[in-house]
Design a protein with these regions (language model features):
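Amphipathic alpha-helical segments used for helix-helix packing
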Residues: 96-116
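Short, hydrophobic secondary-structure boundary micro-motifs
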Residues: 29, 103-105, 114, 147-148, ...
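N-terminal intrinsically disordered/low-complexity leader segments
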Residues: 1-7
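Helix-turn-helix
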Residues: 11, 19-53, 57
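Hydrophobic alpha-helical connector segments
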Residues: 57, 71-100, 151-158
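Amphipathic alpha-helical packing segments from all-alpha helical-bundle domains
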Residues: 64-67, 71-72, 97, 115-142, ...
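C-terminal peripheral helix-coil segments that are non-catalytic and often amphipathic
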Residues: 86-97, 130, 134-142, 160-161, ...
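Generic hydrophobic, amphipathic alpha-helix propensity
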Residues: 8-16, 33, 58-62, 66, ...
Length: 195
C-alpha cells in the first residue's frame, strides 16, 4: 500500500474490503466500518472524510499495485506474450487474495453518480491500457504478436477478456480457482494473439 498512509488507514482499507466482500459496496458505511473495527464513527472520520474517500484509497491501492506489475513487465526482457501472461496471472493472484477488490475495481456502474470515482477508475484503465499497448506494439514489431489486428483493438480484446473472466469468477461466488483456471484461460488468449 501507499507508504504515505498510516497503519490505521491501512486497517480501515482492509476492513472496508472485508465489509464489501460480505455485504457489497452498499454495506460499506462508516457506521458498519466503525463497528467492525471497534471504534467510534468519529475515529473513522479523522482518517477519511466519507465512504467515497475510502473507496478512492482502495482504488489508489489497486492502481499502485497494478502499476507496479505493468512497469515491471515493461522492463522485463521476456517476450511480449510472456509479459501479457504475467500481467494476467498477477491480476488473478491479486483478485484471489482480495476478491472484494473486484467489486470496487469493476464498479463503474455503481460509481456513475460519483465523478471522482469514475475518474479514478478511468485513470487506472487508461494507464494499464497504455502500458499493455506498448507491450503489444513491441511484440508486433518483433513478430511475436499478430500484426493483422490493430494494436488498440488487441488491447481492448485482452483487457475486456480479463474483465469478463474475473467477473464470471465473481458471479459464480468464487466457485473455481481463479489462478488455476486463469492459467489455462490466458494460454487461450495468447494463442489468439500470437503470431
Amino acid at each position: 500500500m501507499n507508504a504515505e498512509i498510516s497503519e490505521r488507514q491501512k486497517e480501515i482499507i482492509t476492513v472496508s474490503l472485508e465489509l464489501i466482500a460480505k455485504k457489497g459496496i452498499q454495506g460499506l458505511t462508516i457506521k458498519n466500518l466503525a463497528k467492525k473495527i471497534g471504534f467510534t464513527e468519529a475515529a473513522v472520520y479523522r482518517h477519511y472524510e466519507n465512504k467515497i474517500q475510502i473507496l478512492i484509497a482502495i482504488l489508489d491501492y489497486f492502481r499502485e499495485d497494478t502499476n507496479r506489475f505493468f512497469v515491471n513487465e515493461m522492463k522485463s526482457e521476456e517476450n511480449a506474450t510472456q509479459k501479457i501472461e504475467h500481467l494476467f496471472l498477477n491480476h488473478f493472484k491479486t483478485f484471489s487474495e482480495t476478491p472484494s477488490l473486484v467489486s470496487v475495481v469493476f464498479a463503474e456502474e455503481i460509481f456513475r453518480n460519483e465523478a471522482v470515482l469514475i475518474e479514478k477508475v478511468a485513470e487506472i484503465m487508461k494507464k494499464n491500457t497504455q502500458i499493455l499497448l506498448s507491450i503489444i506494439e513491441s511484440g508486433q514489431k518483433k513478430s511475436e504478436i499478430r500484426s493483422d489486428i490493430n494494436s488498440h483493438n488487441l488491447a481492448i480484446i485482452i483487457m475486456g477478456s480479463l474483465r469478463m473472466f474475473v467477473k464470471q469468477w465473481q458471479m459464480s461466488d468464487y466457485s473455481f480457482s481463479l489462478t488455476e483456471r486463469g492459467t489455462e484461460y490466458i494460454k487461450s488468449v495468447i494463442k489468439l494473439i500470437k503470431n
